[in-house]
């Protein structure tokens, strides 16, 4: 397959933080176009192993091509939210111990730029937005059937869009004329309902982000996967996460902080010592892309890297 152009954000920083043992076994929860996976493989010895996940069929095709040329690598067509069961089977069969988990939560550039995937407010295409376009509800199906109150809630909650109610009203009014099935039509509807555009940001950005997050259950899956990773990792294992907007980063930051502090309970509640146990150690401060990377890839401007180690 011809490799599409995609820049893996914070590549060196994330892979250096992840790979502490060249003979170790690692998980890349979001293969995408394989930039991080290839960088991990470069740091692994012949004994090292990498297991990657993605629910996007196109990404899986690239991953299987890589698996065919490198026997240290395996590709799984599934969401990272299901990685614990896959890992349990692989670990039992091969007597593996997990050295680290990497989650790059960004949508890959090819996904954003391919009109037919339905993520873009810049290119017209069918209003889909599913990461796995072989199953589940499309954005168009939801947009054309959801109550106005649900539309407003999703756009506000997952897009942090202050004009969510206006956008929801506009969507309902327009879909009564005819179903909304194309990305540019939706982009125009929500843009016209946004009276105060943020400088340098398309007026449909937040609404499209919100709908994508909702359709793919991104925040629910992230929360569940962080908890799974903690259970899967042994002492010394690394959890490396790259987030791309404040909602994701808030979840990651809070999870790592809470697990580094240990559980908090109300005064007077009877607890055992293991219930108070600290389970993670955060490593350094959150990292952002440097000037050079920003110049090469403007989409890296919103990326935040956080790293923690299992105690």
From Swiss-Prot:
Catalytic activity: cytidine(1402) in 16S rRNA + S-adenosyl-L-methionine = N(4)-methylcytidine(1402) in 16S rRNA + S-adenosyl-L-homocysteine + H(+)
rRNA processing found in the keyword field: yes
GO MF entry, a single one: rRNA (cytosine-N4-)-methyltransferase activity
Principal place of residence: cytoplasm
GO cellular component: a single term: cytoplasm
Binding site for S-adenosyl-L-methionine: 34-36, 54, 80, 104, 111
GO terms of biological process kind: rRNA base methylation
Pfam annotation, one family: Methyltransf_5
The keyword Cytoplasm is assigned to this record: yes
Subcellular location: Cytoplasm
The entry's keywords: Cytoplasm, Methyltransferase, rRNA processing, S-adenosyl-L-methionine, Transferase
InterPro entries on file: RsmH, SAM-dep_MeTrfase_MraW_recog, SAM-dependent_MTases_sf
EC annotation from Swiss-Prot or TrEMBL: 2.1.1.199
Function: Specifically methylates the N4 position of cytidine in position 1402 (C1402) of 16S rRNA.
Family the UniProt entry places it in: Belongs to the methyltransferase superfamily. RsmH family.
Protein name (record): Ribosomal RNA small subunit methyltransferase H
